[in-house]
Swiss-Prot record:
GO cellular component terms given for this protein: cytoplasm; extracellular space
UniProt similarity note: Belongs to the MIF family.
This protein's name: D-dopachrome decarboxylase
Modified sites of kind N-acetylproline: P2
Primary localisation category: cytoplasm
Organism of provenance: Bos taurus
Length: 118
């Protein structure tokens, strides 16, 4: 059950319409997870500094069970997320940062319990 949060300093008018759905589909493909398990949030117009600069930028946070826990996995994921984000947001790679957080089943609540018991 991946959780993906995209924060960007781009104003809402510069964020392509439907980006959240395309990011959901891309995340499912990149992480080999069913699209109906992917959760996406897109926040635009934020005051941000990336690499010491306030030029337009984005930060992606990817949290998931079992697929973001190694450097080897994340190197491949990073390449594919960067390809998607640079195209969609028209930002250079040095204006985008990605953070990967592995989750355990007990850290995700759903249906009044945690994923461990579902």
């Amino acid at each position: 059950m991946p959780f993906v949060e995209l924060d960007t300093s781009l104003p809402a008018g510069r964020v392509p319409a439907g980006l959240e759905k395309r990011l959901c589909a891309a995340t499912a493909a990149i992480l080999s997870k069913p699209e109906d398990r992917v959760n996406v949030t897109v926040r635009s117009g934020l005051a941000m500094v990336v690499n010491g600069s306030a030029e337009p930028s984005a930060q992606l946070l990817v949290s998931s069970i079992g697929v973001v826990g190694t450097a080897e996995e994340n190197r491949g994921h990073s390449a594919r997320f960067f390809e998607f984000l640079t195209k969609e947001l028209d930002l250079a790679e040095d204006r985008i940062m990605i953070r990967f957080f592995p989750l355990e089943r007990w850290q995700i609540g759903k249906k009044g319990t945690v994923m461990t018991f579902l």
